[in-house]
Amino acid sequence: TPVAGLTGNRMRAVADPVRANVFYAYDDKALVASSDSGATFTARASLPSGGSRLIRAAPEREGDLWAPLKQGGLARSIDGGASFKPVFDIDYCGAVGFGKAAPGKTYPTVFIWGSVKGLRGIYRSLDTGATWQRINDDAHQYGGPGDGHFIVGDMNRFGVVYMSTAGRGIVHGKPVTQ
């Protein structure tokens, strides 16, 4: 059954973690939202075309969305997709995900596969995207997230991250102290 308001294919809807029956999707140039359990979607905000089809909703936060826009960088909405602001210093973002918050922090760790100031890699932010720390090295690039389009942190263990790859399965990383 076709879904009203969705024009693309291979889109992946994500649920709002707080509001029941609310879903979001990236429809190549727009963030679309549904408030009727995905029966219909309407455009909320314009976004650059060519981004990853897998947006993320921040855990336990209403309307807090992150959109990896590939060459368009990374954008964040805190109003359910009505508007987006760019996350600074991100030149490219192929995937975004969340993990357990750092000790003493309340916002989940944000992980990306992308480029920060021109340097490609796996990054994490402990401060809602204000600063980024590269957590891989040049010898461990894995071809990026490949067709899986995902990077996700462990919500139970701080610092642990998993990423799909381009032909190498799923890789996982953890802090050297674990």
Language-model-derived ranges and their functions:
Residues 48-50, 88-97, 131-156:
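Conserved blade-ending motifs and adjacent loop-strand segments that build the rim/top face
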Residues 29, 71, 116-117, 167, ...:
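Residue-level signature of beta-propeller blades and closely related beta-rich strand-turn architectures
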Residues 12-18, 54-61, 95-105, 150-157:
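Structural signature of eukaryotic scaffold interfaces centered on beta-propeller domains
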Residues 25-26, 68, 111-115, 163-164, ...:
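Residue-level marker for isolated small/hydroxyl-bearing positions within beta-strands
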Residues 143-178:
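Blade-level signature of beta-propeller repeat domains, shared across WD40, Kelch, NHL, RCC1
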Residues 1, 34-35, 41, 77-78, ...:
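Conserved Ser/Thr-centered positions that define the repeating blades of beta-propeller domains
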